[in-house]
A protein has these predicted regions:
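Long, disordered, Ser/Thr/Pro-rich
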Residues: 1-160
Length: 160
């Protein structure tokens, strides 16, 4: 009995240890998946939205990007990239509550710095000066350890 209890406790600690409480690590740049032990990503629509301060911007322009939970929906973690195809582009600006990652470019990915539940995150993103394309923001949202949505697409943002 004692060994069974010890095994359960140890397995619980290992599973919790795999969570990214202070933001996604750089090795998650491509897949954008948390790989929480014993869980799979949600397949339905995420109860979170991505919105922009503008739907069309000029090359080199900075916009605000907001991740918001619908209703009272809260989340503990996130990871977001602006992409052209599979390539992260642009640059996020830093703040105390956001960790920036270099995923094949400087500061082109943003993630959380703590797993404190929140209902929204405000970010700033700057388009590359030489880019005139349509960009899609890919985002992963973690509601809790077993409930998360991976690499969902935002509405398109035109850079022209």
């Amino acid at each position: 009995m004692k060994s069974s209890l010890a095994c359960v406790v140890l397995c619980s600690l290992v599973a919790v240890g795999c969570a990214f409480k202070s933001g996604a690590p750089q090795r998650q740049c491509e897949a954008m998946r948390p790989y929480h032990e014993g869980s799979e990503p949600q397949t339905g629509r995420a109860p979170y939205t991505i919105s922009f301060s503008k739907n069309k911007i000029a090359p080199g322009e900075r916009i605000s990007v907001k991740i918001t939970g619908e209703g009272n929906e809260r989340f503990k973690g996130f990871m977001i990239q602006a992409r052209v195809g599979d390539t992260p582009v642009g640059k996020f600006s830093s703040s105390n509550s956001i960790k920036l990652l270099d995923c094949s470019g400087t500061s082109n990915t943003a993630t959380h710095t703590s797993n404190t539940p929140r209902s929204r995150v405000n970010l700033f993103w700057t388009a590359p000066k030489d880019l005139t394309e349509t960009v899609t923001f890919k985002y992963t949202i973690v509601k809790d350890y077993v409930t998360y949505w991976v690499a969902h697409d935002s509405p398109k943002l035109t850079i022209a």
